[in-house]
């Protein structure tokens, strides 16, 4: 038995990626040898001829899929061979199948299954009748069937024989691999997903109101809309129907699919006695078997495509959050807001060490506002606090006001307040690692510590939490657990290794994400560090228990040792390339002269240092790294300057131009914090004069942006914003650009939005960026005329975020 070789897998991947087969082959060999994607992308550029991390991740996914396909192909060949039905033609078809779906189509007639009506009919000797009627439509069906009536075989009469023959033909039609493949693609290209509200669910399912009478082609449905409708169905609000094509004017006329089935088997109405029966059989096969089977396939394809896109968005948002600008080594006061239980307070010094904790009760029911301000001021003064990090959960607005009053009352402290996502903080607080890291602290206070540290270094703190708990995705609880975890783990791995890790200060969870390490080795590194003191060289890592040559090769370049024996250990230059640097240093007059000297480095000819092991890409990377060794690729920390006097929703006026922070990006737009405790929405159509397909092309979480207020709805706490600062409130086209066909009911399409879940679902599924609200700003602008349009409500309705009770 033969199957396509690994080489054919590599050639297919190369074709899909648009690269050379030898590049794929080299990458596959490295992956199979235990190398990680970050290591290959950074340190094996010559081998892969410059494949980057994104290409390698795609390659890794395709390799997994194609290997699973080959395993399944082998199993199918073995199964069919055991049945004694493996002809040369069938083998060729199985070996030529390029997708799992095509392979299963071919295998369907041979797949072990429970006894069907068709099998029972065959056992009763009715297959010759079926073959005869299909081969000779001139025969009158009922008359021909009379000869096959046999009560002893369970065939009571001629009609029963005819029913058995129909079952045999229907199964045959529905198991024709080529026919099924053709109909599947036709259905995908022509079909649409329709939704109707279930009777009596109008009020209870109001958040899905955009889908109460809705239909859209499969190929045009964005992921968030598919997931919204599937959730509406799951919650018992919507009935979904897969329509193979647009409804016909004459419902009794055969569909194009029935015509295709009939044509495939030479069935046509030529006035012969058997034609009508055969056409009815083709229709019956389509409606009772093929359409059901393809409906399951298409639904699965819709869900898979929607999940893939949602996972992509989740991963992209997570990447932005992890790579957000770190505030750095600045003493920070963390506030974990709460009402009855109080605001938990934690002060961490410049290194992240907890130096003080407390609980204050500024809000209801105790209302100890002034006393809370005094306590916070004393803590800030005693520990030279520079930043105040406020969690964005319950009571965050009120606690943000407390911080604003603290800044106003004590300008000498020179504090800056920043709203920080607290998503996942409670998960961390109750985790085993938190109890090991902060054993002396009550669980309730650990969240405040995490909030403060997130501002100092988002990446180092967020890696302690399961990525799914960070919550920056759409419909994340509706997604495949395996698919989501695999994608998010890859993002965390890429981010951690892209930034690099200080081996002498990193936590075990952070070390565990470094290439080649894992949780077990991470614990061993920390234990070795605790027992023997800080590492003074990368070579000393080899003394760590169970850290062998392969692990050392994979991790060494990503681990930094600052102030150690060798200055190169603080850079991303891999130890295996140190001889190259020594040669450079010899030419320049020493390593110390070389490092950080842009002029000296630029005077060197990279080509002169290329050898049989290290090519030009690696040498060029080394020169770039030596210019700024250990550089942090993350952006510089800055916060938005909110306008003074604009602190609550009622302070906003249409026409104001404000600075704000992007807190979350969804498929339909971006949410922006402008300092009034309620995020505004920039719809995707208000981001640019040009068409924007993906809002992330324009902004990402954490970006500082200038926005214009287009409309304010205080009753519903809705703010409509635009990035197009020349838009005018009340002018058609301002803030929201209409596109043909949007917003139609009964087969129309809402604008790019979420549907089910509403704003609350978005907020739960979208964490704020680490840096958000700052408390100081400039003067207040002139009042603008009241809005004359309803652009904001329109955008929110189309996004599925409107409260229907207030329509």
Regions found by a protein language model. Give the residues of each.
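C-terminal accessory/binding modules appended to enzymatic or scaffolding proteins
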Residues: 14, 18, 325-329, 493-527, ...
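Accessory alpha-helical DNA-binding modules that contact the DNA backbone or grooves
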Residues: 36-37, 52-117, 121-147, 151-152, ...
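Duplex nucleic acid-engaging cores and interfaces of nucleic-acid transaction enzymes
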Residues: 52-58, 65-334, 338-429, 433-441, ...
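Long, charged amphipathic helices and adjacent flexible linkers at domain junctions
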Residues: 298-305, 310-315, 469-500, 608-654
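Single-stranded RNA-binding regions, centering on S1/OB-family and related RNA-binding modules
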Residues: 561-807
């Amino acid at each position: 038995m033969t199957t396509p070789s690994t080489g054919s897998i590599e050639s297919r991947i190369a074709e899909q990626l648009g690269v050379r087969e030898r590049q794929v082959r080299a990458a596959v060999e490295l992956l199979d040898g235990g190398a990680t994607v970050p290591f290959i992308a950074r340190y094996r550029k010559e081998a892969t001829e410059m494949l980057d991390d994104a290409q390698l991740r795609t390659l890794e996914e395709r390799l997994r899929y194609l290997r699973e396909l080959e395993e399944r192909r082998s199993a199918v060949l073995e199964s069919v061979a055991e049945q004694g039905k493996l002809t040369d033609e069938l083998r060729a078809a199985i070996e030529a199948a390029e997708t799992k779906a095509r392979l299963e189509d071919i295998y369907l007639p041979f797949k072990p299954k429970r006894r069907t009506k068709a099998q029972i009919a065959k056992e009763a000797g009715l297959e010759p009748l079926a073959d005869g009627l299909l081969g000779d439509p001139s025969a009158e069906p009922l008359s021909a069937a009379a000869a096959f009536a046999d009560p002893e075989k369970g065939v009571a009469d001629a009609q029963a024989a005819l029913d058995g023959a129909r079952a045999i033909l229907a199964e045959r039609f529905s198991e024709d691999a080529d026919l099924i493949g053709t109909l599947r693609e036709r259905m995908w290209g022509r079909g649409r997903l329709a939704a109707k509200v279930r009777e009596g669910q109008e009020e209870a399912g109001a958040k899905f109101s955009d889908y109460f009478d809705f239909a859209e082609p499969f190929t045009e449905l964005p992921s968030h809309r598919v997931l919204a409708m599937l959730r509406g169905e799951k919650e018992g609000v919507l009935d979904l129907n897969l329509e193979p094509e647009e409804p016909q004017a004459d419902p009794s006329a055969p569909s194009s699919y029935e015509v295709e089935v009939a044509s495939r088997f030479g069935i046509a109405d030529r006035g012969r006695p058997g034609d009508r029966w055969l056409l009815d059989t083709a229709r019956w096969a389509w409606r009772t078997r093929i359409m059901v089977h393809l409906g399951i396939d298409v639904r699965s394809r819709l869900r898979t495509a929607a999940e893939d896109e949602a996972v992509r968005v989740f991963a992209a948002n997570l990447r932005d959050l992890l790579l957000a600008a770190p505030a750095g080594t600045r003493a920070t006061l963390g506030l974990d807001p709460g009402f009855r239980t109080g605001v938990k307070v934690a002060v961490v010094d410049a290194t992240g060490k907890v130096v003080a904790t407390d609980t204050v009760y500024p809000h209801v029911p105790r209302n100890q506002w002034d006393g809370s301000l005094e306590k916070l001021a004393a803590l800030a003064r005693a520990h030279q606090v520079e930043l105040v990090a406020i969690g964005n959960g319950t009571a965050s607005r009120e606690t943000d006001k407390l911080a604003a009053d603290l800044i106003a009352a004590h300008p000498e402290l020179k504090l800056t307040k920043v709203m920080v996502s607290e998503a996942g903080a409670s998960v961390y607080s109750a985790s085993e690692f938190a109890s090991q890291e902060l054993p002396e602290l009550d669980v309730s206070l650990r969240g405040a510590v995490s909030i403060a540290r997130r501002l100092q270094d988002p990446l180092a703190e967020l890696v302690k939490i399961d990525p799914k708990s960070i919550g920056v995705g759409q419909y994340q609880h509706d997604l495949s657990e395996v698919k989501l975890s695999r994608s998010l783990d890859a993002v965390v791995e890429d981010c951690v290794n892209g930034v690099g890790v200080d081996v002498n200060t990193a936590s075990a969870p952070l070390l565990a994400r470094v290439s080649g390490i894992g949780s077990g080795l991470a614990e061993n590194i920390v234990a070795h560090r605790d027992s023997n003191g800080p590492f003074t060289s990368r070579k000393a890592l080899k003394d760590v228990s169970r850290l062998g040559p392969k692990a050392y090769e994979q991790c060494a370049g990503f681990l930094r040792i600052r102030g150690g024996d060798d200055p190169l250990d603080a850079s991303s230059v891999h130890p295996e390339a140190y001889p190259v640097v020594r040669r450079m240093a010899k030419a320049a007059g020493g390593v110390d002269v070389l490092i950080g000297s842009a002029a000296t480095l630029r005077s060197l000819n990279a080509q002169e240092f290329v050898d049989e092991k290290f090519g030009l890409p690696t040498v060029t990377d080394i020169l770039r790294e030596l210019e700024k060794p250990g550089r942090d690729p993350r952006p510089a920390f800055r916060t938005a300057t909110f306008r003074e006097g604009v602190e609550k929703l009622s302070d906003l006026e249409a026409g104001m131009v404000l600075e704000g922070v992007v807190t979350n990006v969804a498929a339909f737009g971006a949410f922006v914090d402008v300092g009034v405790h309620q995020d505004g929405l920039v719809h995707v159509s208000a981001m640019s004069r040009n068409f924007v397909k993906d809002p992330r092309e324009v902004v990402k979480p954490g970006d500082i942006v200038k926005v214009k207020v287009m409309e304010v709805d205080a009753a519903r706490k809705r703010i409509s914003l635009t990035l197009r600062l020349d838009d005018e409130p009340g002018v058609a086209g301002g803030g929201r650009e209409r596109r043909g066909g949007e917003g139609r009911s009964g087969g129309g399409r809402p604008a790019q939005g979420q549907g089910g879940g509403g704003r609350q679902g978005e907020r739960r599924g979208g964490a704020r960026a680490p840096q958000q609200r700052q408390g100081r700003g400039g003067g207040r602008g002139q009042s603008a005329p009241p809005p004359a349009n309803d652009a904001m409500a329109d955008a929110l309705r189309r996004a599925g975020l409107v409260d229907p009770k207030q329509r």
